[in-house]
Amino acid sequence: MARTCAETKLVSDTYDIDGHDPCDAPAGPECLPLDGWHRARGGRMVEFAGYWMPVQYEGIIAEHLWTREHAGLFDVSHMGQLVLSGDGLDAAVEALLPIDLATLKPGQQRYSLLLDEDGGILDDLMVQRWEDHLYMVVNGATKWDDIGHLREHLPDEITLSHLDEHALLALQGPEAAKVLARHVSGGLSLDALTFMRCAMV
C-alpha cells in the first residue's frame, strides 16, 4: 500500500505540479518514512526508484564537499530491507547466493549477489547475521523483483519480512565515526566496528 504524505508540502517548485502533493497520487511515487522530516527542512524532492527522494538541501556541491571533508547523512530508505528466518535458513539462502553463510557469525556482514536459476546475476546485496535470522539489503531499483524472486524460490519454512516502514540511513565521510560516537550508548565500542562488522545501537 502506498504511503501518503498529505500533511507535508512539496518543497521543490520544479516538481510541484499545480500545488498537488504527488504522494497522494495512487499510481505515483511513494514517500519514504522520513519524507515529512526532509520536506520540513527544505529537502528538494525528486522521483527515484518509485519514491520521492531528497536529492539536496542547500546545494549539491556544498553538501558533496562537506561530506568529503567531514561527514554526511543520506536517506537510502528506498532500498529493500529484508529479514529472513526459519528452519534450514542458511541452506535455503545459500541456494540463491554464492557465499557460505555457515561461517557468517552474528554481528558480521558480507557482500554477495542474488542469482537466478542459471547462475546469472540479478542484483548485488549485503547480508548480516543477527542471532537466528538474516538481515538483507537489496537495491531500490530492483527491490520488488528481488523480493519476488526470493519468495518464489525460498521454501515455505522460511519467513521473509519486508521492513518497508523502517528508514535506512547511510553515514559517510572521514568524520563518520566521530559523528556516530555521539549517538551510541550501552558501552558499544566503535573500535570493534571494523570492516564488514555491524552492531545494534
Residue ranges and their predicted role:
Residues 1-201:
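Basic, glycine/lysine-rich polyanion-binding surfaces/domains
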